[in-house]
Amino acid sequence: MNGFKAVRVPVSALSGEPLPDVFGTKGDCLVAFEVKAPKAERAYSPREQVEKLFLFLNFFEPFSQKKAVLGAKFPRKWVFRMVEKPDDFVVSREEQSSYHLETQ
């Protein structure tokens, strides 16, 4: 992850805990990822799941940069979208990533 220290959180079932699928740190930056692997052309992330990313990020006060990112793994393509607030989101296979680790 481009100099990031990262951890995959192995939670296979829906959990009441605000745990992301993956999180990574680099310096004063913390990034939390919710990842989907849809069979269709779109990945849906309901508001409740996105809200958990922000709850997780808020646990860590020392980090001045906190980012919530939705990831979708389509056949032969990944799309990453940074989100600013909890809401319902759809990530399409056709869109370009709005988040890139290289810019960190």
Predicted regions located by residue number:
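Acidic-basic catalytic patches of nuclease active cores, encompassing PD-(D/E)XK
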Residues: 1-13, 25, 62
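Conserved catalytic cores of phosphodiester-cleaving nucleases, focusing on short active-site segments
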Residues: 22-24, 28-39
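Beta-rich catalytic cores
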Residues: 18
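Short, charged, amphipathic alpha-helix that recurs within catalytic cores of restriction-modification
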Residues: 38-70
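Residue-level detector of flexible, active-site-proximal loop/helix-junction positions
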Residues: 13, 39, 87
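Structural signal for conserved beta-strand scaffold positions within catalytic alpha/beta enzyme cores
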Residues: 8, 34, 70-72
